[in-house]
Swiss-Prot record:
Disulfide bridges in this chain: none
A biological process term (GO) from this entry: membrane fusion involved in viral entry into host cell
Secretion signal span: none
The species this protein was found in: Fowlpox virus (strain NVSL)
Virion surface topology ranges: 22-141
Keyword Disulfide bond tagged: yes
The protein, known as: Envelope protein A28 homolog
Entry function: Envelope protein required for virus entry into host cell and for cell-cell fusion (syncytium formation).
Annotated transmembrane regions: 1-21
């Protein structure tokens, strides 16, 4: 055996030992790794200097919108009722009937758990730009 062959054998043995040591360390601390991932999983897709990442685990109808007026929001429709609104109009059950909620939490829950935007009622398209309903919609945006 020459010296080069012995050096390669020693180097290969050291690499294999380091790999096995790392594998054992991961095996030994696996429960700590799982606990860390559960605790800090919400920060996985946060804004960072590396770019903007979108968390697709939660539905957000505003993810694909870049215009602030096009983003869906909950607005005070009447004195004590809330509705989902954007520049496209109000979320509605049918024409001229926006979906109304008694509190803000129910409105937010409806916006972010449905998974899709259904019927939209736009008073500006139906009654014209000068109507009171259209002015109310625009005042919320």
């Amino acid at each position: 055996m020459d010296a080069l062959f012995v050096f390669i054998i020693i180097l290969a043995t050291a690499v294999i030992c380091l790999f096995l040591f790392q594998a054992y360390t991961i095996y030994d601390n696996y429960h700590n790794i799982i606990e860390f991932n559960e605790k800090y999983g919400g920060l996985e897709y946060s804004r960072s200097p590396g770019g903007l990442y979108i968390d697709k685990r939660v539905f957000d109808p505003n993810d694909s919108e870049t215009d602030p007026k096009a983003k869906w929001r909950c607005v005070n429709y009447n004195n004590n009722q809330y509705a989902s609104a954007s520049k496209f109009g109000y979320l509605a059950t049918s024409s001229r009937n926006p979906v109304l909620f008694t509190n803000l939490e129910d409105c937010v829950y409806y916006n972010y758990t449905r998974g899709e935007i259904g019927t939209i009622w736009n008073p500006c398209a139906e009654y014209g730009e000068g109507s009171a309903e259209c002015s109310t919609l625009k005042s919320h945006l």
